[in-house]
Amino acid sequence: MAIRKYKPTTPGRRQSSVSEFAEITRSTPEKSLLRPLSKTGGRNVHGHITTRHKGGGHKRRYRVIDFRRNDKDGVLAKVAHIEYDPNRTANIALLHYRDGEKRYIIAPRGLQQGALLESGPNADIKVGNNLPLRNIPTGTTIHAVELKPGGGAKMARSAGASIQLLGKEGKYAVLRMPSTEIRRVDIRCRATIGEVGNADQINIRWGKAGRMRWKGVRPTVRGVVMNPVDHPHGGGEGKTSGGRHPVSPWGQPEGRTRKPNRPSDRMIVRRRRSNKNKKR
């Protein structure tokens, strides 16, 4: 994926960059795999804001992605097109199966139009093929990994993401996550070979607030510049630091939102490193 920069004809143009979409082979999606997608604007059924900074954005239709691929074991599929998906950072690939069915999958890096893919325990170790973890060699780079057998891919689905299969211990496979966390997963879970494509998406500079509004993202305002009626950090004469430990607009201490003692935490072998401890 190449990134295009523009001449600075306007302030927004000066800062922004866009993808050249060189991998995209078709601009119109498969109509049979589209579903309507309604917007909530961050509100619940009562009309109350439950998630701030959401609203507006361009109209979208949801592309139905096959995250399981377990009912197509042994059926060859041809990559008909690589397409853009507005609902995720990764591109998607349209597969035409030998039995006539069409399905979308996450497009891995290096997948070409016309390639033949397969899923199942006997599939080759080839980019785009889907296999159980017990049939994948140690050290292989994978993505779209299940947390529970048959539950569908949950991990490593965004652009550029990948997981490394470190080893197998009895009925578990040991995985290194993109966050550097090392986790055990049931060896019956399935994964797709390769890493997710469109890795340069992280380097795109949006350049102006308007492009974020097209994505449905509204402005984020700091509490210290609000009035006291709007935020605990608001008010004061001149610029202030808030005068207390950081809190939410409802007075809850900032941070520590991760749920402790989740059932899946017992599968973690080593916690992820903090940013300051990560190897550069």
UniProtKB/Swiss-Prot annotation:
HAMAP family: Ribosomal_uL2_B. Signal peptide: none annotated. It comes from Corynebacterium jeikeium (strain K411). One of its GO terms (biological process) is cytoplasmic translation. Keywords: Ribonucleoprotein, Ribosomal protein, RNA-binding, rRNA-binding. The gene is rplB. Pfam families: Ribosomal_L2, Ribosomal_L2_C. This is Large ribosomal subunit protein uL2. SUPFAM superfamilies: Nucleic acid-binding proteins, Translation proteins SH3-like domain. Part of the 50S ribosomal subunit. Forms a bridge to the 30S subunit in the 70S ribosome. The keyword Ribonucleoprotein applies.
